[in-house]
Amino acid sequence: MKVYAVLRGFPGLGRVIAGFELLKHLENKFNAIVKVSTYLQGDSYINTKGYTSSIEIDEKDISSVGVISVSKSGEKLMEDIVSFNPDIVIIDGEPIFLQNLKISYPNLYIVSLLNPFDVNNPYNQKSSQDFFSYMYSFADLSIVHGLWEEQKPNNFKDYLSVNSIIRDSIPTISFSEKSNSIVCLLGGGSKTVNSGFTYGTIEIAKQVIDIASFNENFDFTIYTSDKDIKNKIINYLKYKELSVENIRIIDSISDEREIYTNARLVIARAGRNTISELLTMNMPSIIIPTTANFRGSEQLCNCRKIESFNFQNIKTHHLDSGAEDLNHKMHKLFNTSVDIKNEVFIPGNLKAIEKILAIMKKKSPGNSIALSTNIN
């Protein structure tokens, strides 16, 4: 089995992590021969896992919705896929490239990984939603994964809607309820987004800095994966003339075990993947949406879903409630039992892999892949 993955490397890492996990799983458990192409933060992420992008994508060939398929980089990417002759092409977040690839090479089997908002986004303008939906419909199989399920659009082909696909390592991570370490996750980045999204991300950091200043017995680590955001946070500290010795700011992509293992509590931007990881670990957490057009609206929907789960260990916070309220919620979570297990949210990895393997078996009836193989 040969699998090629094309993963959009912005605005954060959500588009990269899921596809990359499926790719690694197929490689490690089923001896698939794999290739991956990504860019921006995506390239940095797979480098930390020992992989390199097969094609280097020129930044000028990237649009707000992914690789420009008729650019030099887009053409090189198509040629690389075709020469590899994969059984399956996994594409996440590249509607224009996906459509062009299927038009030019209709016999390629394309699996599209989608966010529920890719399928149904009431906050997006109708013309944009119709445009993206039409492009995504060219995929042979659409796997929609997130915090809720979405109904299959009429124009889509084979379809699966599941909970978020997360990193395989996440269920094995144990956090420390007795540590003094507080982690702030500002997402995988803020590339090609509007100023409101970046502003909201920085505002989360500001409130964390404020509560750090009067919680000196705790160490706060802010992970951003974005040097521009780190610089803005440092400028805020200078402007406020704050010398907060219990704060570290990390602007590089860090291993998930390093981030979570010693944390007592996580304060995080309300992205789909981060929330899904926290739910899976049952990590005491506070989820904060940014304040920005449709991306902010998506994060608000994520928060509403969290509230509907009514988990004692995971709470939401809104920036206009202020740092004092954030501090109150943090200390309240310190007194919440971590023994309460999450039996509501089960990651979608298993169902997604089963679906892909079933397709492979159907495409090649003589294939030796056994669906009964342990794929956990």
What annotation goes with each model-predicted range?
Residues 4-11, 25-79, 237, 244-246:
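Conserved nucleotide-sugar phosphate-binding/catalytic loop shared by glycosyltransferases and other
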Residues 284-325:
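Nucleotide-sugar donor-binding patch of glycosyltransferase catalytic domains
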Residues 167, 176-262:
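Donor-nucleotide binding loops and adjacent catalytic segments primarily
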Residues 90-93, 255-298:
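A donor-sugar binding/catalytic signature common to diverse glycosyltransferases
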Residues 7-20, 190-199:
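A short, glycine/small-residue-rich beta-strand->loop->alpha-helix junction that serves as a flexible
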Residues 120-192, 223-225:
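A nucleotide-sugar donor-handling region in carbohydrate enzymes
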Residues 78-95:
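Short N-terminal targeting/anchoring amphipathic segment
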Residues 332-376:
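C-terminal amphipathic helix plus adjacent low-complexity
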